[in-house]
Amino acid sequence: MTETAKPTKAKSKRTKSASKVVPEGPITIRWDLAELPSSQHKAGLAGLALCVRFLSRNPAAQGICEIEALDAEGLALRVDSDGMQSLFDEIYAASLEEQQRDAPFKDKNKQVVPPKRTIEKLVKDKKGKEKAKTYYVYDSVVPRGDLVADWDQPPAGEAKLWLKLWRDFIWSVLRSMATTREPFTSRAEKRATQDGAETWLGLATNPSAGVELPSTYYLGAQAKTAEMASFRDVSRYQFLLHFWPYVAPLYVPATVDREGKREFTGYAVVVPEIVDLAGFVEDWATVMRERASTVAGYVPRDAIVDIAGEAGLDLAHRVLEVIRRREGQQATRPWLDGVDVFHLAKDGNNVRLRAVQRVDVRRERADEYARSKAAYWSAIFRRQRISNVLDSKPWWSGFGRLCAQTPKELTVQDTKFCRDCRVAMTEVEMKVTTESEPKTLEQLVYQAVRTYVLGRLGSKYGLKWADVGTNPALKQDYEDKKSKLAREAFLAVRSRTGDDFVSYFTATLCSVPQRLGEQGYLELARGLADENEVERIRSLTLLALSANG
């Protein structure tokens, strides 16, 4: 049975405003995972446990704030007013740090705020010429995030990139408005605050009170819905939402435009759906500390994902690897059931929730993701492959559409894309068969396409690999002509669908002698005659032609 707030060996007194009894000593309050309404609340419960443990290492902390009981189902917190204030002082700790701006800062009335000072630096313009540029120095509030900093352990002398990513997210997404930054700002400016004590009073007197639920604490919340309904929560549940940002890993989705340039598009926030609180608390620090701090652009390389949902797969893989090392290969239930991935991005002064995706934690899916992530180099190829993992689709699914809609410079003419197609169709995705086993449709298509390209290379240009030898000029000519033939066929296939594609495949790609064997011919013919298989063969054909490009 779930407990509510209760006094622990405490005298009581009444508040001036009403008949609420206020304990003078600590209260004990318990939460169980099963009663909490969302993954954010459950993550908040885990964050509470880790923050209280971290607070116990601070000798300056005052009052009582301790975990009285912690098990798989939940925890009990014993805390008094001073202890709660110390806890809030920890999670909202901040400092004033000098930051340089390339333009003067303006207040809400569009008035220029005088800087502390200005400095000049030599910078290069687009033409490479140096010129002097003025920078304006202001004191800025920076969230400390000491718990996150404790998990971020780069090599000596290098920046804590994961901490910076967390700070940027807090400031640009969760606390993008000045009014929402007050808990941090007041502490950075060393002003007295009573937010912890006030929260404790609410939990001590009326833990089940209804309260508003702003988006500062709950991702996806709105002031009013389209039906003019407001988001509401229970006080004892909303309290937990102060802590989930400490245990929600952050990722940065990257997109590639039609010119091949990469651009970061907001944040992918991974909120864990916890089913074993004690297991989570035991392993979480290890999961966080094992992330690499190698920089890519201005963020950790391990934080970059090709699609927002990939963030959930990456966390699932990391969690399962930690559990696997600790428990061995035995079938151990993970302490995560799944994750909710929130894709958030700034749009002017607003924060947009672009998508929410649920990703279940399954070993086979996590392993398939890790294999794909490691094997492929092209961001476009990798994005489609990982999207198929997320959607539980065959590895080749969607590549026909991708090749048809993406500029050829990023597919058949891109070295990395062609390399990935070759690796996929010869190593990573291919089922290993013996000579006695029938070849799969993927193997038959790859063999037919390669035979066509090499056959046309010989009949049209008189080039054979056996004649190339060690002559570098002949080898280069051979590769150039082979790529030319593959690209021409690629462009012809991508513009054809349905019966038009089938006609091209049989009349052109099969115009050279093929050695597929009777069973292979029958399997390929069945596929081309089945309208449900034609798109599969078309996708595989485009991939096979790229592999030979």
Range-by-range predicted roles:
Residues 214-389:
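Domain-exit/linker segments immediately C-terminal to small folded modules
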